[in-house]
């Protein structure tokens, strides 16, 4: 039943979403949008090395998109780049391939497990995970380009 996906835990998460707003100086921002439901999540991320040190988000989403964003916001600080990539893949498999929910830092995502039976809700549930990985990828790409530029300048001199 659809009541399963809008359970008490989901509604409590959606109603208590931390870290709302935007960072004044993010290392990268990314936006993910669901064409199906119109939900949009924009994230701002700061990193030190491969660790996320600050995070904020602007969430215009249904209860499921908001709940998944709340889970991300509660647990992303201190996460490593590979960790957020891994949790995105675990979430995708949980929803689309009947895989197990995440464990560890992002274990609260287990509350989203009933969403797997409602394909139309998968995209909004994945928005925050996709946006965070996109922002991390952007940060790493910028760093790689900067390192290549420095290496190129050193070879010229």
Residue ranges of each PLM-predicted region?
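A short glycine-/small-residue-rich loop at the edge of a beta-strand within enzyme catalytic domains
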Residues: 1, 32, 59, 63, ...
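C-terminal binding/interaction regions
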Residues: 1-21, 79-157
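Alpha-helix initiation and capping sites
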Residues: 4, 8, 35-39, 62, ...
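Structured beta-strand/loop patches that form or line metal/cofactor-binding pockets in enzymes
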Residues: 13-59
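A short glycine/serine-rich beta->alpha loop
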Residues: 30, 54-61, 112-121
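Catalytic-loop motifs flanking and including active-site residues across diverse enzymes
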Residues: 64-69, 124-127
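Alpha-helical support elements that line or immediately flank enzyme active sites
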Residues: 68-80
